[in-house]
């Protein structure tokens, strides 16, 4: 183990709050590979239960795609169920909400075919932030004695950064238009076997995705986490977009 690794290990286990916050914190100008290293340190130190098994080699690529998407690029990662792409995305959301010193993104949005799935991702991120309140303090905005948005479809951080859940499935009755344009979108579970069997449903989802992308802020970007189940569906529509960088994760074999 190198001297630097020993120092990092000592900070994680014995360091002050200030030392840990500096270890995990990043800025827009921080080299991207260094941000990835900081994310991995943060995730493993704060949420070790997500790493009971050895991480697959492709996880580094997925993390880098998340970082580049958050910074400026449109990325798509298509992988098999169980490859941890959604878990990594949730941990990444928590990482940037807590550690981005420049607050590069001010409004994050999670969009799924079924609204309940987007709400679950948002709620999970909220609960993960609560778990590290001993290090980061209370990070949620309060307005007098008004109850914070806890298990609902969104919440606001103390610095003003927002995250909310939405759907690209059926139109929600009473849907309220966003007052502000999101500047980063996570598309997750945009289609399934049922939706792919209907061109009407597929086209409706595509139109909703297109509308969401059009509604991004001028410097906004998005990340698509998906399973590639058809070359005629929503995922293929994303893949065909010239502005989207695509990564397809192959199935692991027994020796991988």
Name each region found by the language model.
Residues 1-83, 87-256:
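Short, flexible loop motifs at catalytic/binding sites
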């Amino acid at each position: 183990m190198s001297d630097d690794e020993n120092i990092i290990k000592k900070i994680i286990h014995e360091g002050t709050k200030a030392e840990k916050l500096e270890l995990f914190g990043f800025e827009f100008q921080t080299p991207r590979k260094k941000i990835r290293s900081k994310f991995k340190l943060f995730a493993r130190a704060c949420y070790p239960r997500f790493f009971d098994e050895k991480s697959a080699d492709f996880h580094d690529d997925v993390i880098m795609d998340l970082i580049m998407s958050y910074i400026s690029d449109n990325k798509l990662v298509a992988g098999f169920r169980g490859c941890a792409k959604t878990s990594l995305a949730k941990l990444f959301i928590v990482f940037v909400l807590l550690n981005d010193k420049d607050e590069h993104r001010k409004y994050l949005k999670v969009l799924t075919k079924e609204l309940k799935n987007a709400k679950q991702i948002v709620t999970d991120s909220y609960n993960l932030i609560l778990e590290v309140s001993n290090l980061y303090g209370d990070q949620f905005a309060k307005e007098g004695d008004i109850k914070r948005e806890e298990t609902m479809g969104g919440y606001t951080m103390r610095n003003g950064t927002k995250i909310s859940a939405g759907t690209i499935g059926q139109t929600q009755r009473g849907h309220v238009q966003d007052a502000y344009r999101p500047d980063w979108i996570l598309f997750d579970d945009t289609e399934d076997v049922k939706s792919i069997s209907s061109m009407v449903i597929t086209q409706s989802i595509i139109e909703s995705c297109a509308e969401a992308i059009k509604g991004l802020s001028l410097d906004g970007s998005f990340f698509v986490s998906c399973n590639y189940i058809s070359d005629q569906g929503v995922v293929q529509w994303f893949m065909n977009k010239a502005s989207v960088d695509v990564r397809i994760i192959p199935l692991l074999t027994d020796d991988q």
